[in-house]
UniProtKB/Swiss-Prot annotation:
Name of the gene encoding the protein in the UniProt record: clpP1
One term of GO molecular function: serine-type endopeptidase activity
The protein's role, per its UniProt record: Cleaves peptides in various proteins in a process that requires ATP hydrolysis. Has a chymotrypsin-like activity. Plays a major role in the degradation of misfolded proteins.
Protein name: ATP-dependent Clp protease proteolytic subunit 1
Originating species: Pseudomonas aeruginosa (strain ATCC 15692 / DSM 22644 / CIP 104116 / JCM 14847 / LMG 12228 / 1C / PRS 101 / PAO1)
Cell location: Cytoplasm
Subunit structure, as described in the record: Fourteen ClpP subunits assemble into 2 heptameric rings which stack back to back to give a disk-like structure with a central cavity, resembling the structure of eukaryotic proteasomes.
Pfam family, any one: CLP_protease
Protein family (similarity comment): Belongs to the peptidase S14 family.
Length: 213
């Protein structure tokens, strides 16, 4: 796919409400207008903002796959500001990040909590960042189910399986022992940027652009 290929429109943030700035580019072929997020996508920048849910996850996955097709060797930059959300939606993003050829650099802007923190930690080693006043939080998955006792038991086993799997992923990316992860995710564990670096959740707190890759 060529560098001049169609750049897909990014409607998720626009749909969240408010006006999205437009950028007009001029060339010998005339003018072309982009919403700001589609223009940033041309620079291989993806925004993951708000609750992690199926629609948003599908858009992020589509953008990751598109940028891989554009250039499988060049890094992708994923900016995260999310309180977390659906485990299955988040895992679709995580698995795609690990699946594609380009390195995915992750940066927390604001907050990366719950599934947002796992996606932040799942970035390419050495390329996981946050801004100075960002907050990160890890915890165990939340679940609630009503129904027959046998169905409740089935769902309880599934939640415990998901909890163990998420802990294994965090242990892999942070370098922390699995028992430490299990202890720390038993309740909400908030971290500053410096604390997240020490924990292994990220690699560096960015204060200026030239500190990033």
């Amino acid at each position: 796919m060529s560098r001049n290929s169609f750049i897909p429109h990014v409607p998720d943030i626009q749909a969240a409400g408010g006006l999205v700035p437009m950028v007009v580019e001029q060339s010998a072929r005339g003018e072309r207008a982009y919403d700001i997020y589609s223009r940033l996508l041309k620079e291989r920048i993806i925004f993951l903002v708000g609750q992690v849910e199926d629609y948003m996850a599908n858009l992020v996955v589509a953008q990751l796959l598109f940028l891989e097709a554009e250039n499988p060797e060049k890094d992708i930059h994923l900016y995260i500001n999310s309180p977390g959300g659906s485990v299955t939606a988040g895992m679709s993003i995580y698995d795609t990040m690990q699946f594609i050829k380009p390195n995915v650099s992750t940066t927390c802007i604001g907050q990366a909590c719950s599934m947002g923190a796992l996606l932040l930690a799942g970035g390419a080693a050495g390329k996981r960042y946050c801004l100075p006043h960002s907050r990160m939080m890890i915890h165990q998955p939340l679940g609630g189910f009503q129904g027959q006792a046998s169905d409740i038991e089935i769902h309880a086993k599934e939640i415990l399986f998901i909890k163990e799997r998420l802990n294994q992923i965090l242990a892999h990316h942070t370098g922390q022992p699995l028992d430490v992860i299990a202890r720390d995710t038993d309740r909400d564990r908030f971290m500053s940027g410096d604390e997240a670096v020490k924990y292994g959740l990220i690699d560096k707190v960015m204060t200026q652009r030239d500190l990033a890759v």
